[in-house]
Amino acid sequence: MKVMTAMYTIRRGGAYDRFIMMVEAFLERNCETHCLSLTPIPINHSYFHNHVMYLPLKTVDGLIAKLAVVLLFPLWSFWIAWRKNVDVIIAFGSLYAFLQGFSKWILKKPMVTFIRGSSYFGLKIRNSPRYFLHFNKLVEYLGLLLSDRIITNNIATRDEMLKRLGKRKNIDVQILYNNIPPMNIRKPEDIPNTRGKYGIPGDAKVLVSAGILNRGKNVEILIKCLPTIVGINLYLLVVGDGSTDADFRYEDYLKELAKKLEVDKNVIFTGWLEKEDLWKIYLASDLFILPSLSEGMPNVVLEALGCDLPCFGSDISGIRDILQYDELIFDPGDEKTVADKIQQFFTNRQFLDNVKRLCQSRKDVFAFDWKDMVFEIIMGGGAPQSH
């Protein structure tokens, strides 16, 4: 079996982790895997063939690089797919489905597309021009129409895809939830070391939130809650950073807000952490909270559950799919409800025990082999048929 996929470049974040896992799922089953990219993909395997398009540019993030991708990727993917005689095309996002759709159409090869969240929301919070938002929406729609099978990671996204496709019922749309990754870091002695590293007293309570730090993460609601929570020496760890000027301005805004509310000594920005360091912070914390305004299916919540860390999160698609219970979710715009839940968690033993029980039940749901599942969904019953 030969498959072809593409990834502009590998960055930080859960979506890129899942892309690597998807590629590994095929490599572990001895499938010849071809990947188009602008920078080398960090995979070393005899069945992995990375076709890197080297551009004479200082960065792959500029407008010229992106235009080059839109113009050249379709022809380049056709050349690779034809020359290597691939059996299946895998698009990790509707944009890649659009770019590889030419190959699928000419060569009559089936194409499976992963949809992992709303790129429209991400572009909107970065104040992208309106014409670019409309162009992105059109490209995404065409990418969906070219697909033979679509795999989403939450119920709301699946329903949205079905609505956008309208009468194109011959396109198979399925859900594959993210899983809790294998984790082996149970070292209680790390807890005082981790707390000491960030200057957190041993008797303090610790909230943690993590992810790519941008306006969509809505971290300000947690900072605003801190002054209203009484009787608790409470610290907030904000793990992660951004990658754009807008993201950096957002982090500056959060720091200024903490100073204004006089809680800056209790709000700690750690920057980006590798997985093992993040998990150590989870083990040293008391409660994980993700107050995002939009998500696909956040790995940070699943990893927190995997560390047996109780979790609260926004009542939005992706997070609700993971946490499910009303006791664990909240309106991301309701500051009072968030503060009340935090207060109850640390002062009401019955509420605390119930939250832990519910989180354990959700942890059990997501303890499965994602690589087995993704391979089975893509290839189970034979490759999808091209239409």
Give the predicted meaning of each segment:
Residues M4, P201-K217, I223-L226, L237:
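Conserved donor-binding/catalytic core segment of Leloir-type glycosyltransferases
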Residues A68-L72, P110, Y120-L146, D159, ...:
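Nucleotide-sugar donor phosphate/pyrophosphate-binding loop at the beta->alpha transition
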Residues A91-Y96, I115:
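Short His-centered aromatic/hydrophobic patch
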Residues L145-D172, I180-N184:
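A short, active-site helix/loop in glycosyltransferases that binds the activated sugar's phosphate group
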Residues W272-L273, K280-S285:
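Short alpha-helical donor nucleotide-sugar binding micro-motif in glycosyltransferases
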Residues L293:
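Aromatic "clamp/platform" in nucleotide-sugar-dependent glycosyltransferases that forms part
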Residues P310-G313:
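Short hydrophobic beta-strand element within catalytic cores of glycosyltransferases
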Residues Y325-E335, Q344-R349:
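Conserved acidic donor-binding segment of nucleotide-sugar-dependent glycosyltransferases
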